[in-house]
Each structure stands twice: as structure tokens, then as C-alpha cells.
């Protein structure tokens, strides 16, 4: 496509979309749309869905939800958008309940392309995928908390007739602060699901080992709902995390330092670590549990696990992206994924 033709097409598309964007509809007034949905609606209102390029853009958006690349987190990719064709990319990744997913996209300096980011939850029993979060070039970064162990999908799509290089990053982070002062997930010595009492019950939490008297701290802002002593948990504290709709359980404390009805902030000391209750024969530790409304106990580890380290940058020179290159070796391996350990095609 020549530069003059491309410039003319862009001007036509821009004028049509701008004019259409000024017309408020009942749907636009009363229904909140994602940036991608709003752009697609303006395409249709302008009649551009009846043009080849408009149809290709809408088809690419749907295709990215069905045909996507399976990636392992943390993930980073540098890519190139070509102006002469409509495109969209889909990335599938596995997440655990309680993990925060952080997504960001950066464009090369000088690029004015508008790019749409949309995250979805995939459920084999649900069609279409459930939208989770979205963004465009006004804020090319967002995060959300996973509500279940599930596969998610990120769609990345630029607007029509724009080109540019981009770098995409998808990383995981905890949704809660760590509940023991000065420690992290390395201090977890017993995990969810381990047999207890000769297999009569399962461990419904994680055990975080620390010296006696180490502060057990609020992992979220909330309200203290119960301060008690029980045969199994010993000295316990319950914290209602209203932001996430869950209760946090602190057990085997040596001392309780809060009262029912007390409001606490992240990092406030709730008690001191000990080995009360049925932990009398074990070293001092905090039993930390999470109970979600309508779900009961869930695995706390993904909620407090350390954030992913920054993913490795691609080894390909970014200036080569979008260009044709010739392979010098007589034989070149085409692999199923972007790492050496993937099988050859």
C-alpha cells in the first residue's frame, strides 16, 4: 500500500470515526463500554464494518479470542504492528485464585498508535469469555485480582492503519501483604492440603515459621471481628477483609494485641507469634488461613506469594521487528514456543 493511499484512507477513517463519536446514543449514555467496544461501535455506526479493512479488524478481534498463544508467566514480548493489515494477538496464561495480574504495554518513542488491551476469563462452560479488565493508550497498564484458578486471555489490538513496535509484559503479584513482619513466602514451612491427624483432615492454610514474639500483622485493611482462644488454634484473631470479601485467620499466637470491632490497616500488629493450641509440640509459627464468602477455606499461598521477577528481555534486536530478514544458516529450527526447550515444528 503506497504512502499516499494509506494517508488518504487514514483521513477518511479518522473523519468518519470522529463524526460518529460526536453522536451520543442511548447505549453510550447508559451502558459503560470498554475502549475496544466503543471503537468497534463507532466503526459500525460509520458503516466501516462493510468495508474490507473494517471487516478484517472486527474479524481479527474475534479470532484472537479463539486462536491464542499459550504463555508462561512472567511473560515479556516485543512485537510490531503493521499498518497495512488489521491484526490482533491473543495470549493465554494460567493464574491462581488470589493472584494479582499486572499487564503493561509500552510503545516505541514517537509512535502514536492507539492500542486496546482486554483481559478475559476463559471457562469451558461459558461462551463468550468473561471480560475482566481493559485499557487503551490513555493508560497502557492495569491490574486485577483473579477470583479463581483459571486460564485467562489477553487480547492486544491496535486501531486501524497504525504501525509501531511494542513491548508487552504480564506478571503476577500478591493481592495481600505478607502476614508476618520481616518475612516472605520463603518462611512458609507447611502448605495447603497437607494431611493432618493421620489423614483425618487436611491443612486448610499455610504455616509461616518465625521466632517467638515476631509480630503477626494485618495483611489487608479491615475490621477485627473475633479475638478468641480455641483448642486447635490456641490464641486466634479473625480479620474481615471487606475489600476482597474474605476473612483472614491468624492462629497459634503467643499474645493477642487487638480487640473485636477495632479497625486496622495493612502492617498493624495483631499479635505475636507462638505455638498455642494444638501446635504446642512444634516450633513457633503463624497458621494463616483465608475464608471466602460462600466458598469456605481457600489456599492462601497465591495471595501472599512474592511478585514475579521481571521477565527476561527478548534477544532479538528490536529494530529488526517488522522487517524481512534472511537466515544465514543452511538449517533453521522453527519451534513451538519462544524458548529453546520447546520442540521443533
Predicted regions and their residues:
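Active-site loop architecture of trypsin-fold serine endopeptidases
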Residues: 231-236, 273-287, 291-293
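Surface-exposed, glycine-biased beta-strand/turn segments
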Residues: 147-235, 266, 275, 298-342
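Zn2+-dependent peptidoglycan hydrolase active-site motif and core
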Residues: 219-257
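Short, acidic/hydrophobic/Gly-rich beta-strand patch recurrent on exposed beta strands
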Residues: 206-208, 236-242, 289-290
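SH3-family beta-barrel domains
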Residues: 32-58, 62-71, 178, 182, ...
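Acidic, Ser/Thr/Pro-rich low-complexity intrinsically disordered segments
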Residues: 21-25, 33, 37-38, 81-138, ...
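C-terminal motif of bacterial Sec signal peptides marking the signal peptidase cleavage site
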Residues: 17-19
Amino acid at each position: 500500500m503506497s504512502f499516499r493511499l494509506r494517508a488518504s484512507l487514514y483521513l477518511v477513517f479518522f473523519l468518519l470515526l470522529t463524526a460518529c463519536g460526536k453522536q451520543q446514543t442511548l447505549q453510550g449514555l447508559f451502558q459503560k463500554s470498554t475502549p475496544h467496544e466503543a471503537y468497534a461501535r463507532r466503526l459500525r455506526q460509520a458503516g466501516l464494518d462493510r468495508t474490507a479493512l473494517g471487516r478484517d479488524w472486527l474479524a481479527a478481534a474475534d479470532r484472537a479470542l479463539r486462536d491464542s498463544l499459550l504463555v508462561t508467566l512472567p511473560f515479556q514480548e516485543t512485537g510490531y504492528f503493521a499498518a497495512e493489515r488489521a491484526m490482533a494477538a491473543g495470549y493465554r496464561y494460567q493464574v491462581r485464585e488470589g493472584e494479582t495480574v499486572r499487564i503493561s504495554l509500552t510503545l516505541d518513542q514517537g509512535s502514536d498508535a492507539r492500542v486496546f488491551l482486554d483481559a478475559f476469563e476463559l471457562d469451558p462452560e461459558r461462551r463468550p469469555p468473561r471480560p475482566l479488565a481493559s485499557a487503551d493508550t490513555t493508560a497502557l497498564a492495569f491490574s486485577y485480582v483473579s477470583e479463581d484458578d483459571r486460564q485467562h486471555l489477553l487480547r492486544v489490538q491496535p486501531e486501524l492503519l497504525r504501525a509501531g513496535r511494542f513491548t508487552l509484559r504480564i506478571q503476577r503479584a500478591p493481592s495481600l501483604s505478607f502476614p508476618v513482619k520481616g518475612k516472605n513466602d520463603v518462611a512458609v514451612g507447611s502448605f495447603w492440603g497437607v494431611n493432618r491427624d493421620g489423614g483425618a483432615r487436611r491443612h486448610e492454610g499455610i504455616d509461616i515459621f518465625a521466632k517467638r514474639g515476631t509480630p503477626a500483622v494485618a495483611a489487608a485493611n479491615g475490621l477485627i471481628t473475633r479475638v478468641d482462644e480455641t483448642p486447635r488454634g490456641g490464641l486466634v484473631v479473625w480479620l474481615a477483609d471487606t475489600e476482597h470479601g474474605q476473612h483472614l485467620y491468624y492462629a497459634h499466637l503467643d499474645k493477642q494485641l487487638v480487640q473485636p470491632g477495632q479497625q486496622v490497616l495493612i502492617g498493624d500488629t495483631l499479635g505475636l507469634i507462638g505455638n498455642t493450641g494444638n501446635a504446642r509440640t512444634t516450633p513457633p509459627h503463624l497458621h494463616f488461613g483465608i475464608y471466602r464468602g460462600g466458598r469456605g477455606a481457600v489456599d492462601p499461598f497465591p495471595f501472599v506469594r512474592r511478585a514475579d521477577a521481571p521477565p527476561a528481555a527478548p534477544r532479538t534486536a528490536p529494530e529488526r521487528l517488522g522487517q524481512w530478514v534472511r537466515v544465514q544458516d543452511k538449517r533453521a529450527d522453527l519451534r513451538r514456543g519462544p524458548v529453546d526447550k520447546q520442540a521443533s515444528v
